[in-house]
Amino acid sequence: MDTFLFTSESVNEGHPDKLCDQVSDAILDACLEQDPESKVACETCTKTNMVMVFGEITTKAKVNYEKIVRDTCRGIGFVSADVGLDADNCKVLVNIEQQSPDIAQGVHGHLTKKPEEIGAGDQGHMFGYATDETPELMPLTHVLATKLGAKLTEVRKNGTCPWLRPDGKTQVTVEYRNEGGAMVPIRVHTVLVSTQHDETVTNEQIAKDLKEHVIKPVIPPQYLDDQTIFHLNPSGRFVIGGPHGDAGLTGRKIIIDTYGGWGAHGGGAFSGKDPTKVDRSGAYIVRQAAKSVVASGLARRCIVQVSYAIGVPEPLSVFVDTYKTGKIPDKDILALIKKNFDFRPGMISINLDLKRGGNFRFQKTAAYGHFGRDDPDFSWETVKQLKPEKA
């Protein structure tokens, strides 16, 4: 049997890049909650004892940026310099301006345009992907890596493994076979977990606890065998972490946010962007399209691309490929997608309810992946049943 290995990684909410994604999206949530028409392009960077937020925000909302930064860092677990950042005593720098009026008139007509006339906030191309290898219709490598990361955070916060600290990374290698273009996972080949820890714990205890409390509850037993390789904190020491260990920046984990290296990526990040930014809204609608194709039984695997020009509502192109797994020709699937999904940015915002912020709606997306999550706030995960036209 011809098989191959494929690997995906994830990082925890305490990873400095992910900390920045969460701060940017917490600010987006705060703006949209008070003013659904907020225009937000918010970047965050961090290093030892410092978090800076900067970018362009036009909103009627009254937002305390410093409080949001500190609350987000504290919620992750950065409560002292020992763990990598002290949320209450670190420096918080804010450099936020209004959106350029040139962009505003071209995209929104200064709020005079109807939703269907609102132009894309920028040029770009985005991809959506779906595969029938998991119930989430997501790649197994990505699902396992992100769930391991989420479980690490869970056992840290609930006290099961008190030696854990917020920063951490996971990586999963799966052996697959290609079944006529569809991906069939056979077994987990390698599991890698590197987690920040305190000074008190031994490497033996780390390995034992990770196997018992993190790996065993997450990876289905049918995928593990006596050949599975485990690398558990292979560097031997990971006490210094978070922004103390590495600098962090919004938008540096775009593959973790999406499909773990499967499918394709147009390069645009999600966090800190309101829905007029097609980097985000375009990627969400093509995920819904690809997922709906697979969930409707029209293909076992599907990728959809959409592209935009700044200020233009209609997409420049829509592309679909089912990797030869389609039950009907790809051109017919493309016609169904165009008929059932409105790719104009103003209509994506309405149909996926993307102007609704607050209650951690977008902050939740900023750790452990934007897709394949079972949460009503992830409106783009809702399947539309697609039925081929009868000849």
From Swiss-Prot:
Its cofactor is Mn(2+); Mg(2+); Co(2+); K(+). K(+) binds at residue 43. ATP binds at residues 15, 167-169, 235-238, 246, 252-253, 269, 273, 277. Homotetramer. InterPro entries: ADOMET_SYNTHASE_CS, S-AdoMet_synt_C, S-AdoMet_synt_central, S-AdoMet_synt_N, S-AdoMet_synthetase, S-AdoMet_synthetase_sfam. Its main location: cytoplasm. It comes from Vitis vinifera (Grape). L-methionine binds at residues 56, 99, 246, 277. It comes from the Eukaryota. It catalyses: L-methionine + ATP + H2O = S-adenosyl-L-methionine + phosphate + diphosphate. PANTHER family: S-ADENOSYLMETHIONINE SYNTHETASE. This is S-adenosylmethionine synthase 1. Belongs to the AdoMet synthase family. Pathway: Amino-acid biosynthesis; S-adenosyl-L-methionine biosynthesis; S-adenosyl-L-methionine from L-methionine: step 1/1. One of its GO terms (biological process) is one-carbon metabolic process. One of its GO terms (molecular function) is ATP binding. GO terms for cellular component: cytosol. Coiled coil: none annotated. Mg(2+) binds at residue 9. It is found in: Cytoplasm. It is an enzyme of class 2 (transferase). Binds 2 divalent ions per subunit. The metal ions interact primarily with the substrate. Can utilize magnesium, manganese or cobalt (in vitro). Catalyzes the formation of S-adenosylmethionine from methionine and ATP. The reaction comprises two steps that are both catalyzed by the same enzyme: formation of S-adenosylmethionine (AdoMet) and triphosphate, and subsequent hydrolysis of the triphosphate. The gene is METK1. Keywords: ATP-binding, Cobalt, Cytoplasm, Magnesium, Metal-binding, Nucleotide-binding, One-carbon metabolism, Potassium, Transferase.
